[in-house]
Amino acid sequence: MAVHYNKILSAKAAVDCSIPVSVNASIKYADQQRREKLRKELARCEKEFKLSKSAMQTNSKMNSKFFVNSLQRPSGEPQDQDVLIEERLTRYPSFSKSLIPSPEGLHLSLPESNKILMNGTQKYPSTAPPRYSGCGHGYDRRPRSAHQFQVVISKTPSGDLLEKHADLFSNNQSPFTPRTLKTEAKSFLSQYRYYTPAKRRRDFSDQRMEAETQTELSSFNSELGTAEKKSSKDSDVSIKQAPNYMRNGAEDKIAPLSLQGQNLAWDKSKDGILQPSSERAPCTQFSPDSKIYSDEEELLYLSFMENVTDEILKLGLFSNRFLERLFERHIRKNKHHLEEGKMRYLLHGLKVDLGCISEEEQNSFRIFNEFHFQKALTSRENRFINDTEAVNHHERQQYQEALNMLSSVPKDENKMFSFPGEFLLPAHKVKHSEGVIVQQVNDETDFEALPWDGNNPSVSDSFIDQETSVDVIEGDSDFEMVETSRELCCLSTSLSPSVPLPSIEGGSNHDKELSTLKIMEMSIED
């Protein structure tokens, strides 16, 4: 049976009734336990305070009665009471301040130093021996004083803390301005797997201080020198056709626009083609003659390019899409204190150095960036020159087609041809006369030439609804036919200046006026 009872006593419950771990780790449960502990401590302190208060009252009564008895003049002491009182006051300096005259007699007020809770013998007055036992015969038989001493302990201090403790505060007149504490502490959430902490933006003043704390500009010359050597090898490509050329009116001289003040150096080769100079300045360097920005601003641009290149090298991506997004983000970040045009110019040069843009596109970009205004001024003149050349070419082509058509006359008399200009070649033979007459016949009899209009230089519509009858008179021999065709081919140069050019005035087709042109009239002699 003992074994049986031991098993019963040592048996454990099937359900775990112990305090769960979550309760011990709970903040709410810990606060509840702490509040309960504080309540118990407060109750114990109140009880001790009541006991100490009653003990302090009895001790104060004993001390006051003893002091009053000691102030009375004994029989064997001198008669001068003033001297005696001064000696007693100097002997007890703590009670000298507590003497307050009142109509009911001497009233002793407890000094401020005694307002604090008594410790040691004052807590337990029953065990403490009396301090002055020699004088206990008289005050026991005297009646108790009606005025008892009370300890006043102020729990809440009265008055303003800034006025009471002004020495502990500085600038008490300044208004309250809350400040954000900047620390290097990391968030607890940064330990989680799917949490991406916010990136801290670098202050502009810190970047400027870093730039100013650098050494002289000579420290950057080594890096710029290597970049200049690399870029000078790629810049030895000649620009065959530059868009900033102006063609002078009648002459064919090509003169480049002035490049002074544009920070671009050009050399003229032997063939007359302009080429960029071999010593091409890097994208972050400018000529000292046209230097606008100060040294501090140049350092800011250098730090801007340094941040861009550092981020590119850190991520290791060099695609065009990535670079465009990265450049735009840095431009938006620095556009408030840096010039956007210069930033784009520097970033474009960086793209060329990275190989994302060819050198030809770089040269065209620079030329467009520097001379877009001059190009806008000369575009109208170039357009007029191109239109004039197109008109002249079209005229020569039409005259050449007409001469080729007339020179290739078929031997068959019954054949008739219809050409795009509606030239009709009815061939009939007259034996008595030897000559070729080519005459253009128009419906109207007005032979006045229309004035030339520069706005409508095209003459392709001028030959519509015109009929040209060509009478070919052949001789008896084939030799005359061959000779006639040769003479017609030689007339190409003499026809072009003598024929006036018709034009179309106005925008409607109803205002067209057709002119009668005499193409040629000649007689072939033997």
Swiss-Prot record:
Record localization: Cytoplasm, Cytoskeleton, Cilium axoneme; Cytoplasm, Cytoskeleton, Cilium basal body; Cytoplasm, Cytoskeleton; Cell projection, Cilium, Photoreceptor outer segment
InterPro entries: SPATA7
Coiled coil: none
GO terms for cellular component: axoneme; ciliary basal body; microtubule cytoskeleton; photoreceptor connecting cilium; photoreceptor distal connecting cilium; rod photoreceptor outer segment
Region (Disordered): 203-240
Major location (coarse): cytoplasm
Tissue: In early prophase of primary spermatocytes.
Keywords: Cell projection, Cytoplasm, Cytoskeleton
UniProt feature, compositional bias: Basic and acidic residues: 226-237
Pfam families: HSD3
GO biological process, alphabetically ordered: microtubule cytoskeleton organization; photoreceptor cell maintenance; protein localization to photoreceptor connecting cilium; protein localization to photoreceptor outer segment; spermatogenesis
Bias (Polar residues): 212-224
Domain of life: Eukaryota
Its biological purpose: Involved in the maintenance of both rod and cone photoreceptor cells. Required for photoreceptor-specific localization of proximal connecting cilium (CC) proteins RPGR, AHI1, NPHP1, NPHP4, and RPGRIP1 at the distal CC, a photoreceptor-specific extension of the primary cilium transition zone. Maintenance of protein localization at the photoreceptor-specific distal CC is essential for normal microtubule stability and to prevent photoreceptor degeneration.
Assembly and interaction partners: Found in a complex with CFAP410, NEK1 and SPATA7. Interacts with NEK1. Interacts with RPGRIP1. Interacts with RPGR. Interacts with NPHP4. Interacts with NPHP1. Interacts with AHI1.
Protein name: Spermatogenesis-associated protein 7 homolog
Organism: Rattus norvegicus (Rat)
